[in-house]
Amino acid sequence: TLTLEDVEVAEHKDINDEGQTIHIPAAQTTATDDSSKINVSEAKKEVSVTDTVAYRNLVPGKTYTISGTLMDQRTGKAVTVNGKAVTSSADFTPDTADGETTVDFHFNTNGLDDTTVVVFEKMFYGKAEIAAHEDINDKGQTIYIPSVKTTAIDDKTATKLTLAEKDI
């Protein structure tokens, strides 16, 4: 609306006018271990986690970047391996305003037993951050790395000690 001395002199209201439309991008993510196909990874091994990013309201044909960081849910800090934060990024050019893309993380879980890892994602157009999904409590972004321990007990002694018999 254009006014002159408090009098409306022009108006332009067109819900379908692309020139008047502001696109507000959004992203939602789901993390899955490539081996288990669920949100649980094995401890003490190299793992691959795929974070599927569902995006909305992007401009088709433009190139975007998704950057992700693995976070320790307990500490709220980045997960580190050999002193470096575990991060990954991927560029993509959508064909449609709404869709999905993936970001792959490859890392060693040695020393991460009993850790809950949460994937934080940011979306960029050029250097401008246009969307983020960083919820430390989001189960969809969460990968569990369990701690597994075993204890052997002798049937006869009911302890960790066994009798010096021929048949054990």
What are these regions (language model features)?
Residues 1-168:
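Solvent-exposed loop/turn and edge beta-strand elements of beta-rich ligand-binding domains
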